[in-house]
A protein has these predicted regions:
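Predominantly five- to eight-bladed beta-propeller fold
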Residues: 153-166, 219, 230-232, 242-290, ...
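Beta-propeller blade signature
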Residues: 165-172, 212-217, 277-285, 327-338, ...
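Bacterial Sec-dependent N-terminal signal peptides
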Residues: 1-13, 20, 695, 757
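Non-catalytic accessory segments flanking enzyme active sites
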Residues: 278-279, 446-468, 477-489, 495-580, ...
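Short, solvent-exposed loop/turn segments at conserved positions within beta-propeller repeat blades
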Residues: 37-41, 74-77, 112-115, 156-165, ...
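Conserved beta-propeller blade repeats
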Residues: 16-30, 54-73, 92-109, 131-151, ...
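Active-site-proximal cap/loop segments of hydrolase catalytic domains
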Residues: 609-823
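Short beta-strand element of the alpha/beta-hydrolase
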Residues: 584-595
Length: 823
């Protein structure tokens, strides 16, 4: 049973689909998902399983779903669709510019292009209010107060008052109201400004009362930000606002862009950030006093813990350290207890995952030297010191305090869940005791908390969103060490783990409700499919099978495992046809990039055009084996480590599979491109290679600036993906030994280089440098440069062109094919 909405015309069909599991109602009875065609056309399905009815829409976004209704917007047509599940009706509201659905009050508020604002009961269709000449509208955080910003007058509606009171403001003292802050449990304040003053009004039973006025220009030369986007209440009496620097700084002269060696940062980028940076102001509405925390010439960031009435601040670029993605920060604390005076806490790593607070907790949490800590007035407490678990990726050199850690999640207000490499650790903030919550390492499992199980609170002036488990149970997704099996498990209020789903596939896009879970499963031989299951795991059903035309997938993927001479465990994926001919040898392509075993069950449509590597389906169907080894790193450096890993993998795989050793190709993109560049400079095992967007000279890359972000690439070399563990000048020999360009004379493998001429993530001149070095050395090298393309080719024609050329390159060298015309 289907309801179809009219469309303007037929959309060209393309068989390849991307499946997205979008929404699930709280009662689990309504599921919303969509598929995206190759031409970006979106087909949206809302399935009411309780009433056995499907609703089909096209190109909707900004979607909302509850137990009773669905809303979605077609922005191109300016249509708003409202589905009432009880009445089984679909209503279309046209010419909608903006909408808000207040489910608690059963009210739909929407604005039209004609500056009209309608308030309706969408279930009955009854129009409650119509306002004309309204520029915009805004709701309070709790959706109880509506501010209508008019050309002539402002109107305030209180949806929770007994009389649904309406306040009309004609005389605004040349003030335009722009912002509502607060809630019913605290207070409602209305903010606006004249040409030179900030005005704050407080809502009272009979209207608004002006409670605060202040000049926009402040005593430290800064000015109040009148957009009011960074405005919030700490409590009823403390209002947080933003200020901006009083004047615009300039890092350029009439003839030159000025870079100052003494600046903490790249001068033009620093100036741009400081001109846009907002610093915190605090207005005490009780004492009618403004606290101006502005520091001129500084890039200051803040974190406000609203419930605890605490402010943390730090100078973002104080420690000018390009060796880290997130330089250290020196953190200070302000609180009402100490009259908002600044108190230093300590120096921490500046990763947004490393330092955080929860509004429900008085503690500051931070990660330092392998362990999690919390800080309060009594000092610091180590949370995980006694845990038999690793909370960081030990493979990264000097990375114990940086980005590759997972954020803690608050659980039942008084407990903290911390994800380790395989396990989940529980710390009780009330008893200050920790324990293993889920021990994945015992069962060859790696557990992660399902994102949809986490409620994220976002407010202005926070380090990052406040993460808390939504509900009393914890849903976990797991995979085994080979990624050949994945599943879903739940930990109930009794703290007992129970498996719900286990599949030979890859699970993603998990949505949860009170009693139903929806999720997508895919495999190398099965296109993504949407399933639902109840929390007992007993009732499971297929909701939608994407790419249903793709049924004859005659390939297999296997994990090859071994121990090297040092007793270290190693792995590689081998992909092949299911019906290899006995006695026949097959050309092979080795695809490299970090760890590949996690891609075991990744589905690839044969229609996917891949320009930054290969579509393994198509190459297998064309008679190749595809080998994807895990790369492991040691102190010798990333290039040398990659050679060891690939050589070991090939020796193992060649003894198990019918590999034509005389016809093996190598390919990689980005970091895989670097690995490809280096590997062929150290071995003649490969007959040909394709490298896209790769680094060739670590020395020059260390000194390169990303022109898009205006951030130097040093951090990527020292402590991130290149894992060098030292800078260029202290470790010059190591940089030299891991730079492909230094071994151009050794390369005997024909190489195809690919880059986009707007790529500054890996500067495209790295490919040019390798091309010139190989050309100078008289080697076989060709290069494809695509104008206007970045790190990944996005233009459809360019993607197909690169994909076709890569295919013809491998056919020519590995299968004795005809020489391509473009060569």
């Amino acid at each position: 049973m289907f309801d179809f909405l009219p469309v303007s015309g037929q959309v060209a069909q393309d068989r390849s689909e991307v499946l997205v599991n979008d929404l699930l109602s709280a009662d689990g009875k309504v599921i919303a998902y969509y598929i995206v065609k190759h031409n970006k056309h979106r087909e949206y399905t809302i399935r009411d399983s309780h009433r056995n009815k499907d609703y089909l829409l096209e190109n909707v976004e900004n979607t909302q779903l509850n137990n009773r209704c669905f809303l979605g917007e077609d922005k191109r047509k300016k249509h708003l669709y409202f589905i009432d599940f009880q009445r089984a009706t679909v209503d279309t509201v046209k010419n909608v510019r903006k909408f808000t659905f207040v489910s608690e009050s059963e009210l739909l508020v929407f604005a039209t292009a004609e500056n009209e604002v309608f308030i309706r009961n969408p279930y009955t269709g009854k129009q409650i209010k119509l306002f004309r000449k309204i520029i915009d509208y805004e709701f309070s955080e709790d959706n109880e107060i509506l501010l209508l910003k008019g050309k002539i007058k402002d109107v305030i509606l209180d949806f929770k008052s007994a009389s649904k009171s309406e306040i009309v403001i004609h005389d605004r003292e040349n003030c335009r109201f722009k912002k509502i802050v607060g809630s019913r449990s605290e207070a409602f304040y209305f903010l606006g400004n004249t040409a030179d003053s900030l005005l704050v009004y407080k809502k009272e039973e009979d209207g608004l009362r002006k409670v605060f006025k202040h000049s926009l220009m402040l005593d430290k030369g800064n000015r109040i930000d009148t957009l009011f986007n960074h405005t919030a209440l700490l409590n009823e009496n403390n209002l947080a606002l933003a200020s901006l620097a009083g004047g615009i700084r300039n890092s350029s002269s009439s003839k030159a862009e000025i870079w100052r060696g003494g600046d903490n940062g790249i001068s033009p980028r620093l100036t741009e950030k400081m001109n846009k940076a907002k610093q915190l102001l605090l207005v005490d509405m009780k004492d009618l006093k403004l606290y101006n925390f502005f520091i001129d010439g500084k890039l200051i960031d803040y974190n406000v813990n609203y419930k605890q009435q605490t402010i943390y601040e730090y100078e973002a670029n104080e420690h000018d350290d390009y060796s880290k993605q997130f330089p250290d920060i020196t953190l200070y604390q302000r609180s009402r207890k100490y009259n908002w005076e600044k108190k230093m806490i300590g120096r921490f790593n500046g990763s947004p995952n490393s330092v955080l607070t929860f509004n429900a907790s008085p503690y500051l949490f931070y990660f330092l030297d392998k362990d999690w800590y919390f800080y309060d007035d009594r000092g610091k407490t180590n949370i995980t010191g006694s845990a038999q678990a690793a909370f960081y990726n030990a493979e990264y050199v000097n990375f114990r305090n940086d980005a590759f850690i997972k954020r803690p999640v608050l659980y039942n207000k008084q407990k903290l869940l911390l994800e380790a490499v395989n396990d989940v650790y529980l710390y009780d903030l009330k008893t200050n005791k920790g324990s293993i919550f889920v021990a994945g390492s015992i069962y060859d499992r790696n557990y992660d908390i399902v994102p949809d199980n986490i409620k994220a609170l976002n407010r202005p002036w926070m380090f990052s969103s406040d993460w808390e488990i939504n509900g009393k149970t914890v849903l976990l997704k797991w995979n085994n060490s080979n990624y050949s099996r994945e599943g879903l498990s739940v930990v109930g209020e009794n703290n007992k783990l129970r498996d719900i789903v286990e599949v030979d596939g890859k699970i993603s896009q998990v949505k949860i409700s009170d009693n139903i879970i929806t999720y997508v499963v895919e495999s190398y031989n099965q296109p993504p499919a949407l399933y639902k299951v109840d929390r007992s795991g007993k009732r499971k059903g297929l909701l939608y099978q994407s790419n249903s035309w793709d049924t004859d997938i005659r390939i297999k993927t296997e994990v090859v495992q071994w121990e090297n001479s040092k007793g270290e465990k190693r792995k590689a994926l081998v992909r092949s046809a299911v019906d290899l001919i006995l006695g026949k040898k097959y050309p092979a392509i080795v695809s490299v990039y970090e760890k590949k075993v996690s891609e075991y069950h990744t589905y690839v449509s044969p229609d996917n055009v891949v320009s930054s590597g290969i579509n393994y389906r198509n190459y297998i169907n064309n008679g190749y084996l595809v080998i994807e080894p895990d790369i492991h790193y040691d102190e010798s450096g990333p290039g040398v480590s990659a050679v060891k890993s690939v050589e070991e993998a090939l020796e193992r795989v060649e003894g198990l599979y019918p590999v034509d050793k005389e016809n093996i190709g190598l390919t990689g993109h980005s970091f895989g491109g670097y690995e490809t560049n280096f590997i062929i400079s150290q071995t003649n095992r490969f007959k040909t290679a394709v490298s896209s967007a790769g680094v060739s000279d670590l020395n020059s890359f260390f000194l390169t600036v990303n022109w898009n972000t205006m951030v130097p690439d040093m951090w990527r070399m020292e402590t991130q993906q290149w894992r060098m563990g030292t800078d260029l000048f202290s470790g010059y020999d190591k940089y030299r030994k891991n730079s492909p360009v230094n071994y151009a004379q050794n390369v005997n493998t024909p190489l195809l280089l690919i880059a986009g001429k707007s790529d500054y993530k890996i500067n495209w001149n790295q490919s040019v440098m390798y091309f010139m070095a190989l050309k100078k050395a008289g080697k076989q090298v060709n290069m494809l440069l695509y104008p206007g393309e970045d790190h990944e080719l996005l233009n459809t024609e360019n993607k197909k062109d690169a994909s076709d050329k890569i295919n013809s390159w491998f056919e020519y060298y590995l299968k004795n094919g005809n020489k391509p015309d473009w060569l």
